[in-house]
A protein has these predicted regions:
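Short glycine-rich anion-binding loops that position phosphate/pyrophosphate groups of nucleotides
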Residues: 118-120, 252-256, 316, 452
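Conserved core of the PLP fold type I
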Residues: 134, 143-277, 289-303, 307-309, ...
Length: 475
C-alpha cells in the first residue's frame, strides 16, 4: 500500500538537531516525537531500515535499534512481510508519562519514586507479543497436554529453553536435566530440599547477599554460612576453611547487592573447590542479561556442568508476576530433584507453551535488546545525576544489572537516610538489610533503576540528596 509509505527521513531530520547522545538514541527520540505530534501518522509504514539508513547517511544498525526501541515502547508494530507500521497511540499512556499514585507503605509514606531494587520496567512488558504467544500456544495445544502436567515441566519448553541457554549463556543444557519452576526462589528451595535429603546441614552463601535466601534455607532445615564478597566476587578460597560445607549459592554474573562480576580467577578457584570437595555450586544467573560496558560473561555451569546447578528466571527480564523459572542440574542430581518434587510447581501448561513460543519466535531476544538500550541510558542518567547532586557519594556495581551500590559519605547513617527518603516519597534499600551483621561505619544504599521512569531520575536524586544531607552528621 504505497500511498501510506511515509517519507520518514524528511520527517525526522527536522528534529535530529535536538539534544545530543548516540545517533540511534537521537533517531528514536525524533521518531517518537514525530509519532506523538502526528507528523508520522497512525497506520503509515516506515521505510525499510536499509533505505532509511541510506537516506540518513548512517549505519543500518542505528535504524534497526531505533525501530526496536519504538516497538518496545508500543509506538510501532513490526509484522513479517508487512514492514513496520506506526500504531495509533492517541489516548494511550506512554512509558514516560507520570505513574499513577502508588499505594502507601506500612509506615504511611506514599512512594512516588521507586529506587528500590527488584523490579524491571513492568510498563515496558511486551504485552502484544506475549498475547500473540499465548494465542499461538492455545491454538496448537494437544489434547495430551491438557492432562496432568509433567512435574519437570513441558518437554517442548525444556527443549526450546535448553537451546536458548546454550546459545545465549554458553550453558551445557540438556532438556533431560532441565526442570521448569515457579521462579528462581522456587528452584533454590527445591535444590535445598535435595541437599537436606542428601545429609547436608549448611550451605555457604554470599555476604552481603539476598536476605530472603536465609529464609529459604531455614525452611529446608539448612544453616547459612556467610562467605564475604569483595570487588572480585565471592572469596572462594575461604570455602576450604569450612569442612562441613559442601554446597554454595553464588551469583557470578552480577552479585546482589554488591553488583560485582566474579573475576575469572575466582571462577576457577570456585570450580577447583567443587572438584576438591565434591561440592555443588548453585549458580543463580541473576541479572546476567543486562551487561552494558563489555561483552556478557558465560555461565559458570558451562565450564563445570558436573558440579554446577544453574538457576534462572524471567523475573528481571519480563516480570516477576509471570512466575517462570528453571534450573539445569548435573546428570547425577537430576533424579534426586525429580524425587524431591512433591507436586508440579511450575506455571500452567498453557503459560509454559506460550513462553516456549515467545522464545522460539525471537520475541524474547528482541525484547532484551531493546531493554538493554533503555537500561543503559537510564543507568547513565542516574550516575550523572548522583555525580551532580551527591559528589561525596561513590558508586560501585553499575556495570551490569538493574541496581547499583551508592556508598555514603563519612558521618552518614544509611538507615536514617532510607527513612528520610521514604518520607519524601523515594524508596531505597539500606545495604545493612542484606548483611548478616550491620556495619554502621560503611553506610551504603542499594539503588534499583529498573522500574524508575526516565523523567523521574532527576527528581528522585534531588530528594535523595536532601535525605542524605539530613542523615549526615558534620564534625
Amino acid at each position: 500500500m504505497e500511498k501510506f509509505q511515509t517519507n520518514c527521513a524528511s520527517d525526522v531530520l527536522l528534529d535530529l538537531a535536538g539534544p545530543g547522545g548516540p545517533l540511534h538514541v537521537q533517531l528514536t527520540r525524533a521518531m517518537r516525537e514525530a509519532i506523538r505530534s502526528g507528523r508520522l501518522q497512525a497506520g503509515s509504514t516506515l521505510p525499510p531500515s536499509r533505505r532509511l539508513a541510506s537516506e540518513l547517511g548512517c549505519s543500518r544498525w542505528v535504524v534497526t535499534e531505533a525501530y526496536a526501541q519504538l516497538a518496545a515502547e508500543g509506538y510501532v508494530t513490526a509484522t513479517a512481510g508487512s514492514g513496520t507500521r506506526v500504531r495509533n497511540v492517541s489516548g494511550e499512556a506512554t512509558r514516560d508519562q507520570p505513574l499513577p499514585a502508588a499505594p502507601e507503605t506500612a509506615a504511611g509514606a506514599r512512594v512516588l519514586l521507586d529506587l528500590a531494587p527488584g523490579l524491571p520496567e513492568v510498563r515496558a512488558f511486551p504485552m502484544r507479543q506475549w498475547i500473540s504467544a499465548v494465542r499461538s500456544a492455545a491454538a496448537s495445544v494437544a489434547s495430551a497436554d491438557l492432562g496432568y502436567p509433567d512435574p519437570a515441566g513441558h518437554p517442548y519448553l525444556r527443549q526450546v529453553l535448553a537451546g536458548y541457554l546454550a546459545r545465549v549463556r554458553g550453558a551445557e543444557a540438556d532438556a533431560a536435566n532441565l526442570v521448569i519452576t515457579a521462579g528462581a526462589t522456587d528452584a533454590i528451595g527445591l535444590l535445598c530440599r535435595v541437599l537436606r535429603m542428601c545429609g547436608h546441614s549448611a550451605v555457604a552463601v554470599e555476604h552481603p547477599g539476598w536476605h530472603r535466601l536465609r529464609e529459604v534455607l531455614t525452611t529446608a532445615g539448612l544453616g547459612a554460612v556467610p562467605i564475604p564478597v569483595d570487588d572480585q566476587g565471592l572469596r572462594a578460597g575461604l570455602l576450604y576453611g569450612h569442612d562441613a560445607v559442601r554446597a554454595v549459592i553464588v551469583s557470578p554474573a552480577h552479585q546482589f547487592p554488591a553488583g560485582v562480576v566474579m573475576s575469572p580467577q575466582r571462577r576457577a578457584m570456585l570450580l577447583a573447590w567443587a572438584r576438591d570437595s565434591g561440592g555443588l555450586i548453585i549458580e543463580d544467573d541473576y541479572d546476567a542479561e543486562f551487561r552494558y560496558d563489555r561483552r556478557p560473561v558465560g555461565v559458570l555451569q558451562g565450564a563445570g556442568q558436573s558440579s554446577v546447578a544453574l538457576i534462572g528466571s524471567v523475573t528481571k527480564t519480563l516480570s516477576p508476576a509471570m512466575g517462570v523459572g528453571w534450573m539445569v542440574t548435573p546428570a547425577d542430581v537430576t533424579p534426586l530433584v525429580h524425587a524431591a518434587i512433591v507436586r508440579p510447581s511450575g506455571p500452567p501448561v498453557i503459560d509454559q507453551l506460550a513462553f516456549a513460543a515467545f522464545l522460539h519466535s525471537g520475541h524474547y531476544d528482541r525484547h532484551l535488546r531493546a531493554a538493554r538500550i533503555r537500561y543503559r541510558a537510564r543507568r547513565n542518567r542516574l550516575v550523572g545525576a548522583i555525580a551532580a547532586h551527591l559528589p561525596d557519594c561513590r558508586i560501585t556495581g553499575a556495570a551490569a544489572g538493574l541496581h547499583m551500590l551508592m556508598h555514603l559519605p563519612v558521618g552518614a547513617d544509611a538507615a536514617s537516610a532510607a527513612r528520610l527518603a521514604l518520607a519524601a516519597g523515594v524508596k531505597v534499600a539500606n545495604l545493612d538489610v542484606y548483611r548478616f551483621t550491620p556495619i554502621p561505619h560503611e553506610p551504603a544504599l542499594v539503588l534499583g533503576y529498573g522500574n524508575l521512569g526516565d523523567h523521574q531520575v532527576e527528581p528522585a536524586v534531588a530528594r535523595l540528596e536532601l535525605a542524605i544531607r539530613g542523615a549526615t552528621s558534620r564534625p
